[in-house]
Regions:
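Substrate-binding clefts and catalytic carboxylate motifs of secreted carbohydrate-active enzymes
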Residues: 5, 13-19, 25, 171-175, ...
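Hydrophobic faces of well-ordered beta-strands that scaffold small-molecule active sites
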Residues: 307-309, 341-343, 365-367, 408, ...
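The substrate-binding groove and active-site-proximal loops of carbohydrate-active enzymes
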Residues: 104, 166-169, 251-252, 310-323, ...
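Loop/turn elements at helix/coil->beta-strand transitions in domains of secreted/extracellular proteins
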Residues: 304, 334-341, 359-364, 399-405, ...
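Secreted/periplasmic carbohydrate-active enzymes, especially glycoside hydrolases
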Residues: 1-340, 589-590, 594, 619, ...
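Active-site neighborhood of glycoside hydrolase catalytic domains
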Residues: 360, 377-472
Length: 818
């Protein structure tokens, strides 16, 4: 039977060239330990990042003692298991170096029986400076990599974004970042198990194939969500099959429940492991069609429109990431009607808790392997390392119901093919000559080695070579009509929001727009004098080149200029929400042709101006509230024609009269037909109805339905707006508004917003049309069931989800510039 001795907890740590020891905690990191004992201030405060970066130009030593008994040494196998060493680690036992680790993403295992003795033993791990290592490698073997990061990062199997990104600081921490322990066993050890599913009418056959080090008989059982237990007898066979009658199927969020079955495998020698699985089929359809080739998730035979965002590491200081914090973030995804999440390839493979929570919440996981924005040298050592890394991580993740596909890398095929020159030009990538071996190495890695490992390790998990891609082999990897797409002409290309409507991507896996965090968040990393977007500290917390200028450029196109720093932050969030709304609503209206909208990005790694919908401190931006509406299972939206779509620069000559019209569409991303009333009204700024209409509409399951275009030639360009809603059983399940000009030119009148609070209920009253009403507490954090919403004259009831409703104030677009 396998036994473990935990080696985590209290350690000590020092700079390699110093004899001054600091107390340390494992799992943890150098930065976390230096902050804990007061040696280093928080690197997220103001410009402290610079000092923290300099500290990582040194080597660090971790040390602890532990006791081993004669009984433990009597086992046939005594192993040191390190589930995460970050990254260049020399491991010594009792004064003798026994191993060197150089991959953060690997679980390292060494047999140490001969190096241990009964009594007290000393374990020491020395971490080489990742900065100095990468600098040396960058000189020795140059090659293309993201210029936002420290040069040479591509040579090290370490989370790339720790070296900096266009949303993250340069804080390449080091340390023992995951559990470390001694493991003893004798004749057999249960390493893992492969579970395969075969679905038939009313039955799912589950094949269980244990992976055993050594030899042992084994048995298994499956416990259903209702407690029913199905057993498999003890056997020495390689696999057994168990039939589950009347299976409870796992569905993505919004389409059904997420029942999980518990699989227990036991060895006769005593080892036992438990996994949770969901019964479902999950693949990707690439059927040819009239537009090219579709790309969509297919779950239990149903084609699903993916709605979600791209996930990056939650913190540069990895010790701060906890299962509770991750659950909070992912529950906020479900609250915003996500059914999917993409784990971006420039970070690290998340902990098991991440995938467990996605299983529970119904979030389909697009899992990148950890390669991003760089060309790699496939040396023999590198190949050996990535083979182990890929097998280990895929084997760890493969049983999860939420695992939708495994993708080879982020943006490497696109950059190597030069498929998107607009993106490259606007991103300020600094290209170096592409060496021929980089192309051949890429093909070997992502079209032969890695897909073969994934197929062998997780034969029922879909493989996709890169993001974006049309299927590999450098065949137009950002093609609008095939595969997945990264679209950045809105933002990097500074195109207007309406530009999204020109494209019908089969699956948009990246598109985004920046905003600043709210004032409460800015106050947590700045001094009062820093609170100007062009201050040194605010620019330090803005890592995308020229981004603040882009925000102001878009602001000039959209709103009146704000009168305060707080209003500027607010305006940036409103623009972000509007930009992404334009894209998502357009693609959902074209369901069938378009089958995925994954927003860049969900979260922040530190306090920063970025594309995130939830900031570093967990506060929802306006975008996340908007996502809750435009990702709603049943959603009404308008494709309006007006000045923004035809003549956004009002002084340019436009020979034809501007079309003023709108066309409504209702999307139904549920497994049942939905019948309701579509109601709309053309209104003046005070809410007075000029004309209106109502009609009954049935939208079939998993579809989108257009209504006829409504001509508004008689409407005032700047003095009329349209309100619309889809009403089911007298409840407006989705609603919105549209105008025919930029908000800055609309003839808003003071809505005279009033806010009343009654416990966890907030009643908002508006006396005129109010656009993007924002409610916030002056003192406390506040999460609401709706925010940044449009209002006709009247009242709206908003519920408090988290926080206190005391001292709540409201504002809207009317307040900007006044």
């Amino acid at each position: 039977m396998t036994e473990q001795v935990n080696l985590g907890g209290a350690w000590r740590m020092r700079e390699a060239d110093s004899q001054t020891w600091h107390s340390a905690h494992v799992p943890g990191s150098v930065y976390a330990d230096l902050m804990a004992d007061g040696t280093m201030p928080d690197p997220f405060w103001r410009e402290n990042e610079l000092d923290a970066f300099e500290r990582m130009k040194k080597d660090y030593v971790y040390q602890r003692t532990f006791t081993v008994t004669e009984a433990q040494l009597a086992h046939a196998h005594v192993e040191l298991v390190c589930e995460g060493l970050d990254t260049l680690a020399h491991v010594s036992l009792n004064g003798r170096e026994i191993a060197f680790a150089d991959n953060m993403h690997i679980t390292w295992v060494w047999d140490v029986k001969e190096q241990l003795h009964a009594g007290e033993n000393t374990l020491e791990i020395r971490f080489d400076s990742p900065i100095l290592y990468c600098a040396k490698k960058a000189e020795e073997a140059p090659g293309w990599e993201s210029s936002d990061a420290t040069p040479g990062f591509r040579h090290l199997r370490k989370a790339h974004c720790m070296f900096g990104w266009d949303w993250g600081p340069r804080l390449p921490d080091a340390g023992i970042w995951r559990p470390i322990f001694l493991r003893t066993w004798d004749t057999a050890r249960l390493e893992n198990a492969l579970m395969l599913q075969a679905h038939h009418d009313g039955v799912v056959d589950v094949t269980i194939r244990p992976e055993i080090a050594g030899e042992s008989a084994w048995s298994a059982e499956i416990t259903a969500p209702d407690g029913e237990v199905l057993t498999l007898p003890e056997t020495t066979a390689a696999e057994q099959v168990i039939a589950i009658q009347n299976p409870q199927l796992w569905w993505p969020n919004g389409l059904g429940k997420q029942p999980l079955y518990r699989v227990t495998v036991r060895l006769a020698t005593g080892d036992t492991r438990v996994w949770r699985i969901g019964l479902r089929t999950m693949t990707v359809s690439r059927e040819k069609d009239e537009w090219g080739e579709e790309f969509c998730h297919v779950v239990n035979g149903m084609k699903v429109f993916a709605m979600g965002a791209d996930y990056i590491p939650e913190d540069n200081i990895l010790a701060r990431v906890t299962p509770e914090r991750t659950r909070h973030l992912l529950e906020d995804c479900k609250a915003a009607n996500f059914n999917a999440i993409r784990v971006w390839g420039g970070g690290y493979y998340p902990d098991d808790a991440f995938y467990d929570i996605c299983d529970e919440l119904g979030l389909m996981v697009w899992q990148d392997l950890m390669y991003a924005c760089a060309f790699y040298d496939l040396t023999p050592d590198f190949e050996r390392s990535i083979r182990v890394e890929t097998h280990q991580n895929v084997a760890r993740l493969r049983h999860h119901a939420s695992l939708a596909l495994i993708c080879g890398n982020n943006e490497m095929e696109m950059f190597m093919a030069g498929a998107n020159s607009a993106l490259i030009n606007h991103r300020t990538w600094e290209f170096v000559p592409t060496y021929p071996h980089h192309i051949t190495d890429y093909v070997k890695m992502f079209e032969y080695i890695l897909p073969a490992i994934v197929k062998e390790t997780a034969p029922q998990t879909y493989w996709w070579p890169a993001s974006p891609s049309s299927g590999g082999n450098f065949d137009a990897p950002n093609d609008e009509n095939r595969g997945d797409n990264h679209y950045w002409d809105v933002w990097h290309g500074e195109k207007p929001f309406t530009e999204y409507r020109k494209f019908f991507f089969r699956y948009a896996s990246e598109f985004g727009f920046q905003s600043f965090p709210c004032l409460k968040s800015v106050e947590q990393f700045t001094l009062p004098d820093d609170r100007n977007i062009f201050s040194r500290v605010m620019e330090r917390h803005q890592r995308n080149q020229a981004a603040n200028g882009k925000i102001l450029s878009y602001l000039s196109q959209t709103f009146r200029y704000p009168n305060s720093f707080d209003d500027l932050l607010y305006a940036s969030q409103l623009m972000q929400a509007e930009a992404i709304r334009y894209g998502v609503e357009h693609w959902r209206r074209n369901r069938g042709r378009c089958m995925g909208a994954i927003i860049w990005q969900l979260n922040d790694i530190w306090p920063v101006a970025s594309w995130a919908s939830i900031d570093y401190y967990g506060r929802w931006k306006a975008l996340h509230y908007a996502a809750k509406r435009f990702f709603a299972p049943v959603m009404i939206s308008a494709e309006e024609e007006g000045e923004l779509s035809q003549n956004p620069k009002i002084n340019e000559y436009h020979p034809a009269p501007l079309e003023k019209s709108f066309r409504l569409n209702v999307c139904n991303e549920t497994l049942r037909d939905v019948t309701g009333e579509v109601v709309w009204a053309l209104r003046t700024p005070d809410g007075e109805i000029v004309r209106q209409n109502q009609q009954t509409l049935t939208i079939p399951a998993m579809s989108a339905k257009w209504l006829d275009k409504v001509d508004c030639a008689d409407a005032s360009l700047t003095g009329h707006y349209v309100s619309f809603a889809f009403v089911v059983d007298n409840v407006a399940v989705s609603e919105g508004t549209c105008i025919f000009c930029a908000p800055k030119h609309f003839e808003f009148i003071d809505p005279r917003l009033t806010v009343e609070t009654h416990g966890d209920t907030i009643i908002v009253t508006s006396h005129a049309y109010a656009k993007q009403v924002w409610l916030e507490s002056e003192d406390a954090d506040l999460l609401l069931d709706d925010n940044a919403f449009d209002m006709n004259p009247g009242t709206k009831v908003v519920r408090v989800v988290r926080g206190s409703a005391e001292k709540v104030r409201g504002r809207s677009v009317w307040d900007l510039g006044r």
